[in-house]
A protein has these predicted regions:
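A conserved pocket-lining segment of Rossmann-fold NAD(P)-dependent short-chain dehydrogenase/reductase
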Residues: 1-18, 22, 26-29, 38
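Conserved short-loop catalytic and cofactor-binding motifs
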Residues: 11-14, 44, 48, 101, ...
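Residue-level signal for the nucleotide or nucleotide-sugar donor/cofactor binding architecture
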Residues: 15-21, 51, 108, 123
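Conserved C-terminal active-site "lid" loop/helix of NAD(P)H-dependent oxidoreductases
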Residues: 20, 42, 82-120
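Mid/C-terminal beta-alpha module of Rossmann-like enzyme folds, strongest
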Residues: 26-95, 130-133, 139-155
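Short linear loop/turn motifs
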Residues: 102-104, 124-134
Length: 155
């Protein structure tokens, strides 16, 4: 069961992210056109823009509630713990090096991608979050608000 969601962003700092199936679909479409693209062409996706740094966590809350669960608490990510353990855990040290991405907004421009493809594959946020939670085993694939019993969270 999803009981809490940790948000790494500083309060009020926007963040951009993409749903991996949308990224895969975009890459496949670009590969289909590779013969017409310049060498080393680069494209950016707009993905989902979270202006407040909380939209993703709030989407997780909505998905859990839609499936009959209690809304998980939204909590700040424990950066202090990452800093404390970073001398001993390489991954944490590397994570600290990326923290700046959560402390200032950064937004990519997808105009070149849209010019090339005519669109950007984009799954609605709530649909993407719910599918991700199901895929990760955080939500039951079959549970719905009408059928959710709580047993799904323990299986």
């Amino acid at each position: 069961a999803v009981r809490s969601v940790n948000t790494p962003a500083a309060p009020g700092v926007g963040h951009q992210f993409a749903y991996l199936p949308d990224v895969a679909h975009t890459m496949a479409e670009l590969l289909d056109r590779r013969d017409t693209l310049p060498a080393f062409a680069s494209f950016h996706m707009a993905g989902h823009w979270d202006a407040t740094g909380c939209a993703l966590a709030e989407a997780v809350q909505r998905a859990v509630v839609r499936r009959g669960g209690a809304a998980p608490a939204i909590q700040p990510f424990p950066w202090w713990l990452v800093r404390l353990a970073s001398p001993f855990v390489t991954t944490f040290r590397e994570l600290l090096g990326m923290r700046y991405l959560w402390q200032q907004p950064a937004r990519l421009d997808n105009r070149r991608l849209v010019q090339q493809l005519g669109h950007e594959p984009h799954t609605p946020l709530d649909e993407a979050v719910e599918a991700t939670l199901v895929g990760l085993g955080c939500l039951s694939q079959t549970a719905t608000p009408a059928t959710w019993t709580g047993r799904e969270a323990r299986s």
